[in-house]
From Swiss-Prot:
CDD domains cross-referenced by the UniProt entry: PseudoU_synth_TruA_Archea (cd02866)
Matches recorded under InterPro entries: PsdUridine_synth_cat_dom_sf (IPR020103), PsdUridine_synth_TruA (IPR001406), PsdUridine_synth_TruA_a/b_dom (IPR020097), PsdUridine_synth_TruA_C (IPR020095), TruA/RsuA/RluB/E/F_N (IPR020094)
The organism of origin for this protein: Methanococcus maripaludis (strain C6 / ATCC BAA-1332)
GO MF, any single term: tRNA pseudouridine(38-40) synthase activity
Gene3D superfamilies tied to this protein: Pseudouridine synthase I, catalytic domain, C-terminal subdomain, Pseudouridine synthase I, catalytic domain, N-terminal subdomain
Residues bound to substrate: Y103
Homology family: Belongs to the tRNA pseudouridine synthase TruA family.
Protein's recorded name: tRNA pseudouridine synthase A
Gene responsible for this protein: truA
Pfam families reported in the protein's UniProt record: PseudoU_synth_1
Keyword Isomerase found: yes
Active site: D52 (nucleophile)
Gene Ontology terms: biological process: tRNA pseudouridine synthesis
Reaction equations catalysed: uridine(38/39/40) in tRNA = pseudouridine(38/39/40) in tRNA
Length: 262
């Protein structure tokens, strides 16, 4: 087996689908084209975290049943630098043990009360019943109790950056936590501490809406396995994101001009 550290920019959903246009499908097809993977083994055996379309990743993992170590620049050339990167790989005998997952959300700063958000986030840290802050997956029966290790919040003129650390998360759990903290920062919730206590209880069943997927990135899935990063692929990833940043900064300048002149 080989474990791969992968990154992607959110344009695609993650898990293998019949239409073949997902992160896993793209990587499987690249490995098949290079002759490293048999068609019967095209579905990954393991992944570090299933993400929805719109969510990016810098440190997700997938595992394939294969015998030959791949040359990553060759695999990456098959991916055509189109929003999916295979950063590193390593041969393994057993599945990795996950220590924690680290998600980050960049929220537009619209005069939020950041200190109030920080205070409220402390009530979410620890082991709680998070069913009301998740999307119910009717196809699976999952324990809604999860443990958050830490939440860090920082801000600048444009963004509020929220980092969330935990061993595992329910479907849409991070995005709903972000929406809750954002609404608290906008003073939309009268008594934040009391409401958090209510929404983390089994007596509450109304749920809570999620924030948009586009602001979320899976920064890392920390495991007991260290994977060496290919310097060439990493450089290509940085070049791609720098290009996106430059385009976004130009767009930001245009937006500021229009808003200041109207």
């Amino acid at each position: 087996m080989y474990i791969f550290k992968i990154a992607y920019d959110g344009r695609l959903s993650f898990q293998t689908q019949p239409h073949g246009e997902t992160v896993c499908d793209k990587i499987s097809n690249a490995l098949l084209d290079c002759g490293y993977l048999d068609n019967k083994d095209r579905v990954p055996l393991y992944h570090g975290g299933r993400t929805d379309r719109g969510v990016s990743a810098l440190g997700n993992y997938i595992v394939y049943e294969m015998d030959k170590k791949p040359v990553l620049p060759r695999v990456q050339s098959k991916l055509k630098w189109d929003g999916v990167w295979v950063l590193g790989c390593k041969e393994i005998d057993t599945f990795p043990e996950i220590e924690y997952r680290h998600y980050q959300y960049n929220l537009p700063n619209k005069n939020h009360d950041v200190e109030l958000m920080k205070k409220a986030s402390e009530k979410l840290i620890g082991t709680h019943y998070f069913q009301n802050l998740s999307k119910r997956d009717k196809s699976k029966v999952k324990d809604p109790v999860r443990t958050l290790y830490n939440i860090k919040i920082s801000s600048n003129d444009y963004f509020i950056t929220i980092d969330i650390f935990g061993e595992s998360f329910l479907w849409n759990m991070v995005r709903r936590i972000i929406r809750l903290l954002s609404d608290i920062g906008k003073h939309k919730i009268k008594d934040p501490e009391k409401f958090i206590e209510l929404i983390l209880s089994e007596d509450y069943s109304k749920g809570y809406p999620p924030s948009p997927a586009e602001g979320l990135i899976l920064v890392d899935v920390k495991t007991n396995i260290d994977v060496d990063i290919d310097s060439y692929v990493l450089r290509m990833l940085k070049n791609s994101w720098e290009k996106s940043l430059n385009n976004s900064l130009m767009r930001l300048g245009l937006c500021k001009t229009v808003l200041s002149k109207t």
